[in-house]
């Protein structure tokens, strides 16, 4: 299932400053991560879905670029996002 409006607002309020703060890097990374986990589950059920696999790889690339930006701008926020989302060990 896709990302519903309720899940999206929940993620935005958890990682953003307000309910309308969608541009913050932490919010973007959290939304990308949620979409990536959903697509990963879909691809485990449908391994031959090449179009969704390409979308997944593009999302991973977008998340990587935003994380690199966040690391360059503010390393403490970067580390907090990694810890909150359990991205890297």
UniProtKB/Swiss-Prot annotation:
What Pfam families does the entry give?
Ribosomal_S15 (PF00312)
Q: Does the keyword Ribosomal protein apply?
A: yes
Question: One GO MF term, please?
Answer: rRNA binding
What's in the keyword line of the UniProt record?
Ribonucleoprotein, Ribosomal protein, RNA-binding, rRNA-binding
Which PROSITE patterns does UniProt cross-reference here? RIBOSOMAL_S15
Is RNA-binding tagged as a keyword? yes
Per the UniProt entry, what are the Gene Ontology biological process annotations, in alphabetical order? translation
The cysteines covalently paired via disulfide bonds are none
Which InterPro entries does the UniProt record give? Ribosomal_uS15, Ribosomal_uS15_bac-type, uS15_NS1_RNA-bd_sf
Which cellular component terms (GO) are annotated to the entry? cytosolic small ribosomal subunit
Domain of life of the organism encoding this protein:
Bacteria
Q: Which family does it belong to?
A: Belongs to the universal ribosomal protein uS15 family.
Assembly notes = Part of the 30S ribosomal subunit. Forms a bridge to the 50S subunit in the 70S ribosome, contacting the 23S rRNA.
Q: Which HAMAP family match?
A: Ribosomal_uS15_B (MF_01343_B)
| Role according to the record | One of the primary rRNA binding proteins, it binds directly to 16S rRNA where it helps nucleate assembly of the platform of the 30S subunit by binding and bridging several RNA helices of the 16S rRNA. Forms an intersubunit bridge (bridge B4) with the 23S rRNA of the 50S subunit in the ribosome.
Q: What is this protein called?
A: Small ribosomal subunit protein uS15
- The record's gene field reads rpsO
């Amino acid at each position: 299932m896709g990302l519903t409006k309720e899940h999206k607002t929940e993620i935005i309020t958890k990682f953003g400053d307000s309910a309308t703060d969608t541009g913050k890097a932490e919010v973007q990374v959290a939304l990308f991560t949620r979409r990536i986990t959903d697509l990963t589950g879909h691809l485990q059920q449908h391994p031959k879905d090449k179009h969704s696999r390409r979308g997944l790889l593009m999302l991973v690339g977008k998340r990587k670029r935003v994380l690199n930006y966040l690391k360059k701008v503010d390393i403490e926020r970067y580390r907090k996002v990694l810890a909150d989302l359990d991205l890297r060990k």
